[in-house]
């Protein structure tokens, strides 16, 4: 476990995996350096954990989170807002493997969050008879904050083989104490260079949003990774990032008038004081 007030903990983790990770093959054929089991903690009162040693695209993070919360599984919403991070998995070639039209990703995050366990109609579409985990967890945080069941699961074993990319960030749990909301994410598969910086910021944003609509302050965001890996073709980029000095973390502003998680818009969220080094490009392993 590593705790830090900025991204030093993350940088220590990628340095450790670069230097000590086990070389392994992987599904994509790219090859990785991997380490099993890691944890990072961020006190959200100390700043919003958007990495500064490389520029991270907050617009993509925000719209992807909105997309999950909508229960949407088609990339049109993302593409309409200029977000391309799911394009590689939404091609006609990828979706045809599962009998779906181009752009339709199937029962991934949004579906599992908002309609878990839904049945299918005769036309293959999902009925709206599943569990709305987002609504339920918010109701439980408000009515039963001491519950140890404040959990949302994106992992459905019955459907994990029916999508091109099964959920990597699989389960998150909330914890309420002293008027503060904390969140822990378990990520089964952690692409440390490209994916994890997005995941840290996304779930930190979600924690802020849910805390606000539940009249709570923010506590910690805790990231727990299973297979934590660096792709072999990201090592040069990791070296470049590790050569940079981190800046202070920015602050997050949310429109205080918003009291329903589904009412947030892009203009209701603002990252203030974000100073970063330039972005570092790296290939995506599909």
From Swiss-Prot:
Origin: domain of life: Bacteria
EC number, UniProt record: 2.1.1.45
GO molecular function, one term: thymidylate synthase activity
InterPro entries in alphabetical order: Thymidate_synth/dCMP_Mease (IPR045097), Thymidate_synth/dCMP_Mease_dom (IPR023451), Thymidate_synth/dCMP_Mease_sf (IPR036926), Thymidylate_synthase (IPR000398), Thymidylate_synthase_AS (IPR020940)
Pfam families: Thymidylat_synt (PF00303)
UniProt subcellular location: Cytoplasm
Family matches, as SUPFAM superfamilies: Thymidylate synthase/dCMP hydroxymethylase
Record: active site: 168
GO annotation, cellular component aspect: cytosol
Reaction(s) catalysed (UniProt annotation): dUMP + (6R)-5,10-methylene-5,6,7,8-tetrahydrofolate = 7,8-dihydrofolate + dTMP
Residues at which (6R)-5,10-methylene-5,6,7,8-tetrahydrofolate binds: 57, 191, 285
Purpose of the protein: Catalyzes the reductive methylation of 2'-deoxyuridine-5'-monophosphate (dUMP) to 2'-deoxythymidine-5'-monophosphate (dTMP) while utilizing 5,10-methylenetetrahydrofolate (mTHF) as the methyl donor and reductant in the reaction, yielding dihydrofolate (DHF) as a by-product. This enzymatic reaction provides an intracellular de novo source of dTMP, an essential precursor for DNA biosynthesis.
Subunit structure, as described in the record: Homodimer.
Stated family: Belongs to the thymidylate synthase family. Bacterial-type ThyA subfamily.
Entries under NCBIfam families matching the protein: PRK01827.1-3 (NF002497), thym_sym (TIGR03284)
Protein name: Thymidylate synthase
